[in-house]
């Protein structure tokens, strides 16, 4: 796989909008042509080379390209937006919308990600080794269809409303989450290995949420179905005992499932 290395020159006070940082756009271009790719700096159209040193070996196919961002890009948005193939490795933090609309390929962020990581994601893999802010795998503002495919893994903590309006795919949070994970969820799987503050699965109609830690405050719209051990979801087994709930029956005909680890959640057992 050919590697193209972007080294940040500086991170400006006004965020960069860079949806063109993806293998699909770099494919078939020389290094000089990649330097001339357009990005947004506020309301100005600028060149990628104005803010990044560019080096490496180009390739004709997106699937043969690995973009390495060698430094922190905490003020660069939309990296990998709607990418379909190839790889991106970010050796630092990223701003909002990393992997938004992603259809294929793989993005790895070695630092933290701001809000809307993997928004409206449809395929591929997004891995964040640090923390993620709010709306991981959520819908576009005003839409009622969120993430529908792919896998998002956050090794740290995540914020509010992860998987909002989720329609498919899988989100794994290895740390804790804030309020309303899986709000308006219709399908897919959310795995929370840490704790959740409150309102897990609020107004969910379908899909599955597994919480291995403690749910501090649970919603009243869920029907208790008993205890299940070594649960299996989509061919994957999760060992241990879990309280099983169906809901959220604030929504007519809701069939969403929330599993909460017995060892951490005796306070929500009916």
From Swiss-Prot:
Reactions it catalyzes: N-formylmethanofuran + 2 oxidized [2Fe-2S]-[ferredoxin] + H2O = methanofuran + 2 reduced [2Fe-2S]-[ferredoxin] + CO2 + H(+)
BP GO terms, sorted: methanogenesis, from carbon dioxide
Known pathway: One-carbon metabolism; methanogenesis from CO(2); 5,10-methenyl-5,6,7,8-tetrahydromethanopterin from CO(2): step 1/3
SUPFAM superfamilies associated with the record: Alpha subunit of glutamate synthase, C-terminal domain (SSF69336)
Gene Ontology molecular function: any one: formylmethanofuran dehydrogenase activity
Keywords: Methanogenesis, Oxidoreductase, Repeat
Chain positions covered by the region annotation 7 X 13 AA repeats of [GW]-X-X-M-X-X-G-X-[IL]-X-[IV]-X-G: 80-213
Keyword Repeat part of the UniProt annotation: yes
Signal peptide: none
Enzyme Commission identifier(s): 1.2.7.12
Sequence repeat start and end residues: 80-92, 99-111, 118-130, 144-156, 163-175, 182-194, 201-213
Protein's UniProt keywords contain Repeat: yes
Inducing factors: By growth on tungsten or molybdenum under anaerobic conditions.
InterPro entries: FMH_DH_FwdC, Formylmethanofuran_DH_suC, Glu_synth_asu_C_sf
NCBIfam families found in the cross-reference section: FMH_DH_FwdC, one_C_dehyd_C
Subunit text: This enzyme is composed of seven subunits FwdA (65 kDa), FwdB (53 kDa), FwdC (31 kDa), FwdD (15 kDa), FwdE, FwdF and FwdG.
Family: Belongs to the FwdC/FmdC family.
Biological function: Catalyzes the reversible oxidation of CO(2) and methanofuran (MFR) to N-formylmethanofuran (CHO-MFR). Can only oxidize formylmethanofuran. This enzyme is oxygen-labile.
Identification of the protein by name: Tungsten-containing formylmethanofuran dehydrogenase 2 subunit C
Organism: Methanothermobacter marburgensis (strain ATCC BAA-927 / DSM 2133 / JCM 14651 / NBRC 100331 / OCM 82 / Marburg)
